[in-house]
């Protein structure tokens, strides 16, 4: 992915991308006609998967140039958005952008860790916010953690078809047969 080194090419099957999109859309209850914000670069799996989710679920994709302030010119309510922590942090610094963020029903945050200060601010938001766990090789995320509201949790919940275990040297083994060929 490039987050820990030089990015390299990977090959995935379309079916795996469709499966990943369905897992997310089903888990979050996304339906045809819901407005979803694409505000991440298409050269990364996160941006690509937003497009695939919109195609699979029939979402109305609202496309914005990737920036540190994705809510700066949004003038409509959105059902779903995916952002990186820096985008969320920047958005919360500007009152008008924060107000627009609060009009999103569901926000997923991935691509980096969420520090304690940001997580505390997220807990005050009146929308559903999730942190994602995954990587390029799992076609974005395979687990979600609710960050706010009555269902907030300190733990990630893997999608139903995903099995997690530890190897003999205590490294994580991810068995996600719908989205990857390897564990």
Region annotations inferred by a language model:
Residues 1-9, 136:
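Conserved adenylation A10 loop of the ANL superfamily
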Residues 11-19, 35-90:
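AMP-binding/adenylate-forming
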Residues 15, 86, 112-113, 178:
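Alpha-helix/helix-capping structural signal
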Residues 30-34:
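Short helix-loop-beta connector
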Residues 37, 172-173:
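Short, well-ordered beta-strand segments
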Residues 81-82, 107-108, 165:
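A short beta-strand/loop micro-motif in the catalytic core of glycosyltransferases
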Residues 93-150:
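Gly/Ser/Thr-rich phosphate-binding loop
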Residues 127-170, 176-182:
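Conserved ATP-binding loop and adjacent catalytic segment of the adenylate-forming AMP-binding
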